[in-house]
């Protein structure tokens, strides 16, 4: 889901020498009520100050998204955006509540999180993953294990 903290960081980023790229994937039905205080719709996110300043991109996946659909969406939208942005560092808010077995209704597999780790590692830049979401210990263990295992 959209994070107000990410948007605040973008809004306060200096325009010189630093570019931030916030790409988030919101899982859930498009007409679902917003459950998080201060959450915004994808349409509320802007382009920022251009090449030298903050940039915000949003991408929303449907409810009950599968691994295959996630991979297809990554290939069509995320990979080209990352390639054109050429980050020097990736800080990933790794929301695990999109995994099958969690309460959100998504059907991402541990393999999906391993895929994300490999894709970001393939950029050849440092990455920092901050674990967010995910409430069932067995699901967390499988997804974190898959993500970390893909980095070795």
Summary of predicted features, one role per range:
Residues 134-152:
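C-terminal active-site-proximal or functional interface alpha/beta core segments in diverse enzymes
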Residues 1-119, 148-149:
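Conserved alpha-helical scaffold segments that buttress catalytic/binding sites
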Residues 125-133:
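Short acidic/histidine-rich active-site segments
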Residues 63, 133-134:
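Short loop or secondary-structure boundary microenvironments that flank
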């Amino acid at each position: 889901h959209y994070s107000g903290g990410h948007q605040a960081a973008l809004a306060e980023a200096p325009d010189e020498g630093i570019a931030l790229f916030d790409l988030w994937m919101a899982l859930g039905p498009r007409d679902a009520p917003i459950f998080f205080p201060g959450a915004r719709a994808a349409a509320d996110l802007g382009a920022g100050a251009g090449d030298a300043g903050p940039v915000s991109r949003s991408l929303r996946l449907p409810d009950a998204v599968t691994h295959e659909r996630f991979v297809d969406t990554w290939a069509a939208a995320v990979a080209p955006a990352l390639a054109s942005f050429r980050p020097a560092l990736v800080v990933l808010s790794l929301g695990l509540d999109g995994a099958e077995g969690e309460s959100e209704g998504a059907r991402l597999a541990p393999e999906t999180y391993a895929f994300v780790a490999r894709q970001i590692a393939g950029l050849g830049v440092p990455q920092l993953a901050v674990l967010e979401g995910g409430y069932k210990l067995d699901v967390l263990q499988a997804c974190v294990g898959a993500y970390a295992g893909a980095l070795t």
